[in-house]
Amino acid sequence: VSEESKGEKAAFEIKSLYHGNLRNLNVRVNAGECVVVQDTDNCALRDFLLLLREEKPRSGQILVGGRAVKNVRDRRIAIIQELPVETMIFQSMSYLDNLCFNMDHRFKKVWFSKGIRKSIVSEYGALLGEDVFYKRIGDLTTRQKYDLVYTRILLQNPGVVFCVQPFKKADVSIRSHIWELLERFLKKGIAVVILAVNLADSLALADRLIRIQDGSVQEIYNKEDFVKLPINTPWL
């Protein structure tokens, strides 16, 4: 971990973690910080995601805001999957139901309270567009679908959000919009961890790059050191 991060508040920490291909993994991410984690040999990313989604570590700790994560469904952690407009939107549900899907830990009556739902439409209508709340999911544009997924996570209000290769298959205009959506998390103090095999587009927002090889942290680069990355670094 870089020296400058030690005095700051940790939003997310992994301490001495062993699980699957992960060996003595130590990672710290500060509130409002964007970190790219690159799996250089493509053997750790799957185990890392399984750990966040459904499995407990063999040993070691995972902490959010200094408190241990004991339940894999802990809403303090959010995951934006690879190709989220295909994998994270429920076609059979309304736009508003999709938007509110991760909010029940904050508002227990979100599914039944017209007042809560009306206030969400009022507050986010200007940001998302008033018309989207009345559209069928299949009629949304790609940009509107990205807005839906990322705003759902914003409403969840996690301490950290993990984004799996967020720019994959996105055209140029959508990539720039994804940057804007990620910046919303950062401005709110939410830590962003981009999980990547290749680095195309990912470093534009990053404060640090953590490279993992053989399941352990191999190198850490601060933003000012990105120019020192090896010439054989996989970018595309």
What does each of the following model-derived ranges do?
Residues 14-31, 60:
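Conserved beta-strand
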Residues 30-34, 39-107:
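ABC ATPase nucleotide-binding domain signature region
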Residues 82-159:
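ABC-family P-loop ATPase nucleotide-binding domains
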Residues 164-168, 173:
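Walker B catalytic motif
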Residues 175-188:
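Helical segment within the ABC ATPase nucleotide-binding domain
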Residues 189-195:
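Conserved H-loop
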Residues 202-204:
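A short, surface-exposed alpha-helical micro-motif characterized by mixed small hydrophobic
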Residues 216-236:
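Conserved beta-strand-loop-alpha-helix hinge in the C-terminal portion
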